[in-house]
Design a protein with these regions (language model features):
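Short amphipathic recognition helices of helix-turn-helix/homeodomain-type DNA-binding modules
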Residues: 71-78
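DNA major-groove recognition helix of helix-turn-helix
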Residues: 48-49, 56, 75
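The DNA-recognition helices of helix-turn-helix-type DNA-binding domains
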Residues: 40, 51-52, 78
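Flexible coil/turn residues that form the inter-helical turn or adjacent wing/linker of helix-turn-helix
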Residues: 26, 50-53
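DNA major-groove recognition helix of helix-turn-helix/homeodomain DNA-binding modules
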Residues: 54-71
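A short, Lys/Arg-rich alpha-helix, primarily the initiator
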Residues: 1-32
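Short alpha-helical DNA-recognition segment
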Residues: 26-46
């Protein structure tokens, strides 16, 4: 699957890769964080929202184990 963002194209093969990218990148554009990304391979809808205070890397790990048809994951980038 491809994540299209403002600065580049990122190819990811799993949600774990995606979260690692988000966690490791400190240059993510705030406009990009408000985009709605559709994950065809997982049946998930991931809404990126800057500054959601209750999320952290442990929350990301818990989300990887969810099997819902559609979930919203709110990601904080510090």
């Amino acid at each position: 699957m491809i994540i299209k963002n403002i600065t580049n194209l990122l190819q990811v093969t799993s949600m774990r890769d995606f979260f690692a990218y988000i966690y490791n990148s400190r240059k993510i554009n705030r406009v990009e964080l408000l985009r709605l990304l559709k994950w065809q391979n997982y049946g998930l809808v991931v809404r990126l929202k800057a500054g959601f205070k209750e999320t952290d890397i442990e929350h990301f790990a818990r989300c990887l184990n969810l099997n819902d048809d559609e979930i919203e994951i709110f990601i904080k980038v510090s």
